[in-house]
């Protein structure tokens, strides 16, 4: 299987580098169309998510249009642009982004407290991590290893050149605490469904979902500040990274702190998704824990 992944990766890489930018966009459209038509179960997940999120507030046609744009962005962001950014430089990455409300992060760094940046599978989140490290300093990202070991090595090598440390969420607690103690910016993607033992119930688009409390628990344990941040398209080849006001969990009632801080993270994600639904990664079964039957084909 690793050989198949590797062959596909290098074939796509060859095509991308020999094609002009206009044809790369056509390639992204083709890949998006093919993925949407061939992976029908995944398309059902996307439409189920859109129905659960927007209900009757959007028409079937509007939801289908969001889905099509989501597939295109997936092909462009995680396919073409991911490959184009292999072995890139900090200067080239920073030319692709502008920062909004960066004073929230800068002031938090000046405070000397640990910092946890939470985000979602939204926009070009791969560039997000590289750009933050390039502009603000070393960071550590909590995540899951890829199923393909060779692709995981490629991903890690790409991030390592920006001093972005990848920490496996399975058994990575000590490494995360070490990173926070060293005052590395710690990034966590917090928008996926979790196993019942790993999540707490919050509201997302007016629906019950499970949400990881990892950032909230770590913040309570280490006195860290939590900053929600998201990346989204600003122009044809430009993205904006927007930071929100820090969440200081130490100011909350201790018994309610984790629940409140986690809901705030989920609400920030919802607000961003409502504003730009086509940039969200709708492929996850976000509502599965409480709406499992809706996902059955």
Name these PLM-found stretches.
Residues 3-6, 41, 45, 127, ...:
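Generic alpha-helical secondary structure signal
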Residues 91-97, 144, 162-167, 205-206, ...:
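Short, flexible loop segments at the rims of nucleotide/cofactor-binding pockets, characterized by
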Residues 111-170, 193-199:
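Catalytic core of membrane glycerolipid acyltransferases/transacylases, capturing the structured
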Residues 38, 68, 107-110, 134, ...:
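Non-catalytic C-terminal accessory region of glycerolipid acyltransferases
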Residues 1-119:
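Membrane-anchoring hydrophobic helices of lipid-metabolizing enzymes
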Residues 11, 46, 70, 128, ...:
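Hydrophobic alpha-helical segments typical of transmembrane helices
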């Amino acid at each position: 299987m690793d050989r198949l992944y590797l062959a596909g990766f290098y074939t796509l890489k060859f095509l991308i580098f020999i094609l002009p930018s206009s044809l790369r966009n056509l390639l992204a459209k083709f890949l998006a169309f093919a993925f949407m038509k061939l992976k029908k179960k995944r398309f059902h997940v996307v439409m189920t998510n859109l129905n659960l999120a927007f209900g009757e507030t959007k028409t079937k046609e509007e939801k289908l249009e969001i889905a099509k744009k989501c597939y295109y962005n997936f092909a462009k962001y995680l396919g073409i642009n991911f490959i184009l950014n292999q072995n890139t430089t900090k200067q080239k990455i920073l030319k692709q982004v502008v920062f909004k409300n960066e004073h929230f992060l800068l002031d938090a760094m000046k405070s000397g407290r640990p910092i946890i940046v939470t985000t979602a599978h939204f926009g070009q989140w791969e560039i997000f991590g590289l750009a933050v490290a390039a502009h603000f300093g070393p960071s550590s990202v909590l995540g899951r290893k890829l199923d393909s070991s060779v692709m995981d090595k490629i991903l890690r090598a790409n991030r390592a050149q920006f001093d972005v440390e990848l920490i496996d969420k399975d058994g990575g607690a000590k490494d995360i605490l070490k990173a926070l103690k060293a005052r590395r910016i710690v990034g966590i993607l917090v928008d996926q469904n979790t196993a019942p033992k790993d999540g707490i119930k919050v509201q997302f688009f007016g629906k019950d979902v499970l949400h990881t409390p990892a950032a909230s628990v770590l913040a309570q344990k280490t006195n860290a500040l939590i900053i929600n941040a998201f990346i989204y398209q600003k122009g044809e080849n430009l993205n904006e990274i927007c930071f929100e006001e820090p969440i200081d969990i130490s100011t909350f009632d201790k018994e309610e702190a984790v629940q409140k801080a986690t809901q705030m993270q989920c609400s920030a994600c919802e607000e961003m998704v409502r504003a730009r639904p086509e940039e969200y990664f709708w492929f996850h079964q976000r509502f599965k824990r409480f709406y499992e039957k809706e996902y059955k084909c």
